[in-house]
A protein has these predicted regions:
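Sec-dependent N-terminal signal peptides
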Residues: 4-13
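Acidic, glycine/proline-rich Ca2+-coordinating loop motifs
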Residues: 17-148
Length: 148
């Protein structure tokens, strides 16, 4: 019995020594975002994608009552919010919830699907929410292809 405990301890120490270590770089990364909860909501969404096909993973983060962010990876451990220059500003009218990223039209560029709860102007009542689809144009911008 003691031998098993000893071996388990040795194995645990070995795994701990061989384990990866992480460094918190949040403050210098350029990511300054929080999700403001709308009543009845459970939390926000995030998609990891390479929206500009530069080989580095970018982030799309929903904001709920706050603004969403498309964070471009600057390839040095920092990110820059490019939501407006990517022509995604129409999402700012909505209380967003979730996001999915995929190449919907099979053109080699990652597109976005954003789910919403309501518009920010009608947040006192909850009508049927409009979901948003944005098609990547391949030039750093997206086209809102949602049904109006």
């Amino acid at each position: 019995m003691y031998r098993r405990i000893f071996l388990l301890l040795c194995f645990s120490i070995f795994v701990k020594v061989q384990g990866q270590q992480f460094t918190d770089i949040t403050n210098r990364s350029g990511i300054d975002h929080y999700f403001e909860v709308y009543e009845g909501m459970f939390g926000g969404g995030i998609a990891v994608l390479d929206y500009n096909n530069d080989g580095f993973e970018d982030l799309y983060i929903t904001g709920g009552m706050q603004e969403d962010q498309l964070l471009e990876n600057l390839q040095n451990g920092t990110f820059k919010n490019v939501l407006k220059t990517a022509r995604l500003e129409s999402v700012l009218r909505f209380v967003t919830q979730g996001v999915a990223a995929a190449d919907f039209n099979r053109d080699g560029w990652i597109d976005l699907f954003v789910t919403t709860i309501t518009t920010k102007s009608q947040k006192r009542k909850i009508p049927r929410a409009q979901n948003l689809i944005f098609i990547n144009q391949g030039d750093g911008t997206f086209k809102n292809n949602s049904k109006s």
